[in-house]
Design a protein with these regions (language model features):
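Active-site-proximal polar cores
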Residues: 1-26
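Short, conserved turn/kink motifs that form compact alpha/beta structural patches or helix kinks used as
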Residues: 24-115
Length: 115
């Protein structure tokens, strides 16, 4: 007998993240796409596992799934620039969702301080 997985409907109502390419100087380059997101809590285990790997996770968000979305992009929320440290596809949600582990960076910046 097969059982059906329960699907969770994901809402993206916490804000908008802009996914951008990285320019030649390592800063925010060409805007790829704006996506709505929902923010999740960075759990105790995830936080300390990241710290033991010498990676700091400042924010965990979920966005609608995009096949092209990798760690080769930057995420901009408001005026804050984040490096994408992990991209994880969640198939048990409707619609299909991608979880992004983000690190707030102070070395990277917006070109001319704005979009």
């Amino acid at each position: 007998m097969t059982t059906q997985k329960s699907m969770k409907f994901e809402q993206f109502n916490d804000g908008i993240v802009t996914i951008c390419e990285i320019d030649d100087d390592g800063n925010v380059g060409t805007r790829k796409e704006k996506l709505r997101f929902t923010e999740k809590t960075v759990g105790y285990n995830r936080y300390y596992e990241a710290m033991t790997a010498k990676v700091q996770i400042d924010k965990l968000i979920r966005v609608p799934h995009r096949n092209w979305l990798t760690t080769e992009y930057l995420a901009v929320i408001g005026s804050d620039v984040y490096e994408i440290h992990q991209v994880q596809t969640l198939s048990e949600t409707l619609p299909k969702t991608t979880a992004l582990s983000l690190h707030l960076t102070r070395q990277r910046r917006l070109n001319n301080g704005k979009f």
